[in-house]
Amino acid sequence: MSASPSPSTRADALALARWLFVVAFMVVAIVAVGGITRLTESGVSITEWKPVAGTLPPITDAQWQAEFDAYRQTPQFQLVNGPAGMTLATYKFIFFWEWVHRLLARTIGLVFAAPLAWFWIKRRIPEGYKPRLVALLALGALQGAVGWWMVKSGIVNDVKVSHFRLATHLLVALFTLGGLVWTALDLVALSKGEARSRLRGIGLLALAMLVLQLFYGALVAGLRAGTSAGGGWFNWDAWPLMQGSLYPDGVDWATGAVHALLSDVFLVHFIHRWWAWAVVAVLVVVARKLRKTNRKASIVLHSVFGTQVLLGIFTVWSGVALWIAVLHQFVGALLVAATTWSAHLLGARR
């Protein structure tokens, strides 16, 4: 049997956990801002990746004009926004959201890296946690690179970014969020003298199924498939049906099953909306298992996935209204955190 952690180790573990929860909250926030950036078509408004020099926005009229001139070379401007009459004033709006998204990413990097260095130098990181914290730092760096890789696809090849790259960008963010929450919860357990949790059983299944649902949600977003079912408030032909049918008529299988499963707007939307119920069924089981040992976690999980289902329906009925769709993405991130918490509780060694 391992020795009980010392009071100083317990205090250090709790301090680290609080720091990681702050970073996790910031990741949830950047996922929401990323949703705004996507829905306002702002992602390719900044055509260069300058990790340091790009921290400040343009100040002078000449700087703004230079940024606008660079954007005018993109397919998005030449084929969509240019013919629509985009002005410099309109460009400033989409620039703002992409700049905020990148600034928040830089801030998260600083908020993670600086305290990590301090805890490391002060030898306040408990045994066994250094590799995990370094891995989380590496995931953050990877996310920055994936973000630029995604944006580049909309600058060079198309009027919008690749839906595969968008899905990769979102999943790396949510995987990082799950890692932050799980590690923080392990540290909270250490501060109480308890063992680390194990990801297993129904908790592992729930997270795996949720990952697939989030992947298809990202494909729906990247393909602009949210409106493929139709729209209109309380229009049953748009939900639960799709354009009046249970199964959409427009699925194109001609280019092969793999292409249809990953790139057909009707089929991707269909899978996303119905796989959600399989995920809900598993989450109900998880919540019921938690009810006796942690009623609070059970209520939180029920509340979050219930809200997420309603927001998904409202997103369709509203024709993908900006703030409803952003809330859908925001609550999706909260669902990752809530499911991670639930899986951690189920995997606790007693």
UniProtKB/Swiss-Prot annotation:
Record's keyword annotation contains Transmembrane helix = yes
Where's it mainly located? membrane
Q: Which GO terms describe its cellular component?
A: plasma membrane
Q: Which family does the record claim for this protein?
A: Belongs to the COX15/CtaA family. Type 2 subfamily.
Q: Which GO terms describe its molecular function?
A: metal ion binding; oxidoreductase activity, acting on NAD(P)H, heme protein as acceptor
Q: Which cofactor does it need?
A: heme b
BP-aspect Gene Ontology terms: heme A biosynthetic process
Spell out the protein name for this chain: Heme A synthase
UniProt binding sites for heme: H272, H328
Q: How does it assemble?
A: Interacts with CtaB.
Q: What class of enzyme is it?
A: oxidoreductase
Functional note? Catalyzes the conversion of heme O to heme A by two successive hydroxylations of the methyl group at C8. The first hydroxylation forms heme I, the second hydroxylation results in an unstable dihydroxymethyl group, which spontaneously dehydrates, resulting in the formyl group of heme A.
Answer whether the UniProt record assigns the keyword Transmembrane helix to this protein: yes
Where is the protein found, in the record's own terms? Answer: Cell membrane
Provide the topology term for how it sits in the membrane: Multi-pass membrane protein
What pathway annotation does it carry? Answer: Porphyrin-containing compound metabolism; heme A biosynthesis; heme A from heme O: step 1/1
| EC numbers on record | 1.17.99.9
Q: In the UniProt record, what gene is named as encoding this protein?
A: ctaA
Reactions performed catalytically: Fe(II)-heme o + 2 A + H2O = Fe(II)-heme a + 2 AH2
